[in-house]
Amino acid sequence: MNLGEKLTEGKTKIVYAHPNDPTLAIIIHKDGISAGDGARRHIIPGKGALSGRTTANVFTMLNHAGVATHFVAAPEPTVMIVRRCVMIPLEVVNRRIATGSYIRRHPDVAEGTRFDPPLLEFFLKDDARHDPQISPEEIVAQGIASADEVEQLASESRRVFLLIEEAWAAQDIVLCDLKIEFGRDASGALVVADVIDNDSWRIWPGGMKERMLDKQVYRNMPVVTDDGLEQVRRLYEEVAHRTDAWVNR
């Protein structure tokens, strides 16, 4: 596929301008996987295609549900065409189950505690500062988003969480938490952007942590071996296959 100029490159993707349409961009999914703000990095052959397939399935489902996203099409497993937008430097996290960083920051909360409604947190995208948590008031004060936009980020992220939670629940899988990002399109409207793949959530089949299917398996490895990376690849393949059902109903 023809590509325009490279706009940016991260640990798991490259973003290019679209060669024929200035309102679009092209995302190429890479085979990289990382943890600890990039302190741990590896290559898993085929991961880019699996992550791209999962992301395309998720965004297709969200688009069909009427959620405003940047997703246009996925002509190839590693390629995604999106509406070009200016990213908001925030990670928006909804949590149904207390686990991961939440219980490290809140040791008084037992792992497995259920939040109803889902608990909302914002984190500033800043690898050098390890993506610090940021309050809605600080988001507004720093000019990252307006108060109205913060409310929209909260409501839309919860809507996305509930849609994905329902899709996983149909397969007896618990969505523990979900991290998404937003951008502003050419009109200034907020849209769900970036990617939503197996790096974006924690999912526990049957609600059992020991059966987790997500990136946490990679994070938890004391030593990363070739066999371990193959185990992770198989999990990403299973998740991509499971999300195929979301668009083939």
Curated annotation (Swiss-Prot):
Domain of life, per lineage: Bacteria
Gene3D superfamilies the UniProt entry points to: ATP-grasp fold, B domain (3.30.470.20), Phosphorylase Kinase, domain 1 (3.30.200.20)
Reaction it catalyzes: 5-amino-1-(5-phospho-D-ribosyl)imidazole-4-carboxylate + L-aspartate + ATP = (2S)-2-[5-amino-1-(5-phospho-beta-D-ribosyl)imidazole-4-carboxamido]succinate + ADP + phosphate + 2 H(+)
Record-linked CDD domains: SAICAR_synt_Ade5 (cd01416)
EC number: 6.3.2.6
Entry's Gene Ontology BP terms: 'de novo' IMP biosynthetic process
One matching Pfam family: SAICAR_synt
Molecular function as annotated in GO: ATP binding; phosphoribosylaminoimidazolesuccinocarboxamide synthase activity
Enzyme class of the recorded protein, top EC level: ligase
Record SUPFAM superfamilies: SAICAR synthase-like
This protein's pathway: Purine metabolism; IMP biosynthesis via de novo pathway; 5-amino-1-(5-phospho-D-ribosyl)imidazole-4-carboxamide from 5-amino-1-(5-phospho-D-ribosyl)imidazole-4-carboxylate: step 1/2
InterPro entries, per database record: SAICAR_synt/ADE2_N (IPR028923), SAICAR_synthetase (IPR050089), SAICAR_synthetase_CS (IPR018236)
Record keywords, A-Z: ATP-binding, Ligase, Nucleotide-binding, Purine biosynthesis
Family designation: Belongs to the SAICAR synthetase family.
Entries under HAMAP family matching the protein: SAICAR_synth
Name listed for the protein in its UniProt record: Phosphoribosylaminoimidazole-succinocarboxamide synthase
Species of provenance: Roseiflexus castenholzii (strain DSM 13941 / HLO8)
